[in-house]
Amino acid sequence: MEEEGSGRGGDGPAAHGRIGDTASLGASCVRAGVGGDSPVMVSSASVRKTVKMSETCDFIPYVDDDDDGNSEEENSASSGILPCDGMQHDTPDYIRRGAAAARHRIAPLELFSGPSPPQGPPSPSPAIGGAALEATSNDGVAEPQVHPPEGISSIISTGGGEQETATMGSQSVHETLHIEENEGKCSCCGQLKQEYSLLLREKEECRRVLEDLMRENELKSRECHEAQASLHELRMELMRKSMHVGSLAFAVEGQVKEKSRWCQLLNDLSEKFKALKAEHQILLQESLECKKFVADATQMTTTIQQHVNQYASLECEFKDLKEKFTEETKERKDLYNKLIEVKGNIRVFCRCRPLNGEEIEEGASMAVDFESAKDGELIVRGHVSSKKVFKFDSVFSPEEDQEKVFEKTVPFATSVLDGYNVCIFAYGQTGTGKTFTMEGIEDARGVNYRTLEELFRITKERQGLFQYEITVSVLEVYNEQIHDLLLTGTQPGATAKRLEVRQVAEGVHHVPGLVEARVTNMNEAWEVLQTGSKARVVGSTNANEHSSRSHCMHCVMVKGENLMNGEQTKSKLWLIDLAGSERVAKTDAQGERLKEAQNINKSLSALGDVISALATKSQHIPFRNSKLTHLLQDSLSGDSKTLMFVQISPNENDVGETLCSLNFASRVRGIELGQARKQVDVGELSRYKLMAGRAKQDSKNKDAQIKSMEETIQSLEAKNKAKDLLTMNLQEKIKELEAQLLVERKIARQHVDNKIAQDHLHQQQQSKKPENSPCPTRSPMAERNLNSTAEKPVTLLKDLGIARQMFSDSNTDTYSINHLMSMSSEKENNPAGGAQPTKARRVSLCGGAHQQPAAPPRRGSLIPLPRRNSLMLPLPLPKPATPAAAASPLDMITEQCSSPLVIAPNDIRGGGGGGGRNKRIINSILRRSLQKKVIIRPPLMAAHQSGRRAGAGVAGTTTHGGGGGGVMRARRVPVSGGRGGGGVQHNREKERGWNNGTSLRQLN
């Protein structure tokens, strides 16, 4: 069974569960309860059945019916499916609890499972042999198993838990017990009785146990059926699981492929990882190096930052020092210049040569005393024991060498580099050592060499702060001609090229075409100067074996730039060795030497004239009298520093020339050039001054114009304000007058309508009278006095008295009717009263206002003035006392019209048709009057015309009535003052026409 069970197991090792057959235990119990007195011997052999459990939890072992070699008992025993430990995980809890209880209840069956007692006396205690409990768990742990006797085991094994099987088992047990009882009756009867009693009791107990087991068997049977159903379900689940496993296998296969692919990728990634790892190692090393570099860079950055900060601080300090240096340099320059100015811009040094060998042999004595030379004083003894004292800036005795002479000259070299023009020249009698002082010899260098050496020394010291460019040129003035000594192939005295002095734009004199050699060190500069000096004209005279026959002039141009502030300077250094003055009588010069001496003396004389003019501060300085002075104009005209070496001879035979030279030097020393400055062209300066004067004059004129324009603007603004105020007042007054005019027009229209109606009624009454009624004769219109009011009835004035207040002006005086009548009568009786001036008043309703044929009065209102005659139509025709009293009211209207509108009296005196015609004429007149407009002039035009009217009024005072008219103040129409009476008459006609238009407008 173990082999079969193992053959039906899984592939791997499985845990075998060995379960004792519970049926055999039940059979043994039955057999123990059956029988008589004879003991029952139970075989020790026990029937066991071992079932191998599968490894899988889902697998439930079962016994196949068709297995070969299996006994019927095994099949019968296997028909009842017993639970195994392998199923405990999937078996319900109630089944496991029942099995455990059954095992505990089966425990008393061990009494029947002992081995068979041997033949002989009975053992004191019954032994039940062959009973052994044995069980094997899935994990190999032994469990107790019960082995009943063979008969009981076989019966129980074939029972399966059913009732039939139990009955058959009990019968076989009884048979067996009976046989055994007979065999052992003789030996163990007593013992068996005891055992029998015990067995009976045990029988009952076993019976009860058997019943319990049967009940439990039924229960187990039901549980087995349920387990089979569960097994079927598990099989179906197993099939599903197998299908699922197949699908999982397929999926696993796909996963395997995927895994292989991923493995391939993993291999590739591994290779890449290895490569990356190697690269990582390289990068790690590089990163370490970079870290070192970063640390170094950080340290370097810190160092650089420190240096930058230090540089910034140093730069600030440098700027401060630069500013201080610039200020100190400027201050030093100013102080140095002031020091030179204190000493004198023109300084004179006197140097005396020693006596030569010939003079010593001749026994010549010294005429110059140098006792006070340290104080700058020099004493010259004359022929007649007279002494003359000269004072100079420095006096050098014959014993002093070149070095001591140059010690006093050093400051001028510094002035050249500071940007000032410097001129150093030697003056004196021929043979007094001028060339030696200026040029010297190899062992004793002169002023020229030492000055250039000092220039280059200072230039080297200032290197980095200043940049200098030095050029050198050499020329001579020979016989009043300029020669360039640096031109190659030039012979002494030859005039290869004619050079002239020109004035450049900056006011500096320059010689165009002059060779200027640029030099960078002392050797080059001295070589150029020596080249020019060798080409100088030198001749032999009685006074000197090597006499200079020309003025040798070395020009050193210095252009400097201050690298600190960019300031640029341009200066000039003249080193001049003048030719010596000669006395022709003493030297006995002839021919060419005489001409040279004359030109030399001429140029020196011109230099003396220039010095004299400078000393006396003359307005005109004769620089152009000589080429020498023309060249030295920019060095002697006040914008340079000048040093003069006056060379004298100590020989008493040369006292005259010595005194001349010393006197000339004294005059030079007395010149005050003032502060050094840049020279400006005089013509240009005068032109600039003229332009400045014109500009100032133009500025003054412009200021005056601006002032006058400001005053004009202020006055115009004041006038504009006044005119604006006047305009506002006039506008307000116009509004008031317009309102008043509307009211007056309405009242006038009503009054005129009433009068017209009365006139028509009166005409109708007159037309009804008989023709033989006396009709007053009327005089012709031309013979009537239009302005007379003698024939006007007083009743008419009384009728029209209502309109007196209506047409009065509040701003003008009005007369009462009685007063007007008295005035009218007085004027009629007194013809001279017409010549009296009349006031400009508004006309009242009485007729006396028209008795004076004066000009229309000035009105202060824009309201049209009503005419008296315009309000007197139609009038009744009273009985006339004179023919002049027959004037009709319409004649009064026509009398006021100076326009072409004239209405005949016959038109009014006509019949009924004539009245309609008159009405139409009056309506047309009224329509025309309504179309007229009142013209309001602007304030400016009115102010402009007021002056003209004032003049016209003055001229018009003598034009009316043969020179007796009043003053007329025309307002509407300006009157020309040159017309006399004609202008006044013209103005009167215009006023009358305007008033007529106003009267007709009132009728409407």
UniProtKB/Swiss-Prot annotation:
It comes from the Eukaryota. PROSITE patterns: KINESIN_MOTOR_1, KINESIN_MOTOR_2. GO terms for molecular function: ATP binding; microtubule binding; microtubule motor activity. Keywords: ATP-binding, Coiled coil, Microtubule, Motor protein, Nucleotide-binding. Residues 995-1004 have a biased composition (Polar residues). Residues 63-75 have a biased composition (Acidic residues). Residues 1-21, 61-90, 110-169, 759-791, 946-1004 are annotated as: Disordered. ATP binds at G428, Q429, T430, G431, T432, G433, K434, T435. The keyword Coiled coil applies. SMART domains: KISc. Residues 345-671 form the Kinesin motor domain. GO terms for biological process: microtubule-based movement; microtubule-based process. Residues 189-230, 266-338, 691-742 form a coiled coil. One of its GO terms (cellular component) is microtubule cytoskeleton. It holds the Pfam family Kinesin. Residues 948-958 have a biased composition (Low complexity). Residues 115-125 have a biased composition (Pro residues). Belongs to the TRAFAC class myosin-kinesin ATPase superfamily. Kinesin family. KIN-14 subfamily. PANTHER family: KINESIN-LIKE PROTEIN KIN-14Q, KINESIN-LIKE PROTEIN KLP-3. This is Kinesin-like protein KIN-14R. It comes from Oryza sativa subsp. japonica (Rice). The gene is KIN14R.
